[in-house]
Amino acid sequence: MAGLPVLYSFRRCPYAIRARLGLRAAGFQPGVSVELREVDLACRPAELLELSPKGTVPVLALPGGAVLEESLAILDWALQQHDPYQWRLAASAEPTTAALASALLAEADGPLKHHLDRCRYPERFGVRDP
């Protein structure tokens, strides 16, 4: 799969999920137009750490050597390549649409992520099942 972008991901990471969803929405298909490498976060591969010393996911390595380390940057890049639903055009033409998209992303990064973590990892936060 030489020449394809490579996405380093972890299936349960919400930011990696967002990157995978963004790539799929832009028409990228794992194994066809993007290589997906699931990472064991307990044993991060050396090539991931070479690309991104912080070792977090998602990371998208582009064929030209550029590296994207944030899910929103990956989403933006994917939609720059192919935007089948014209989301970028709609956002640029309609400020209200862009503001709504930003507000939804902020909600997903803030309160939703806070509660999602407590639901998925209750032992980390001392949460007991009612």
Model-inferred region functions:
Residues 1-130:
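GST-like domain detector, emphasizing the conserved glutathione-binding G-site
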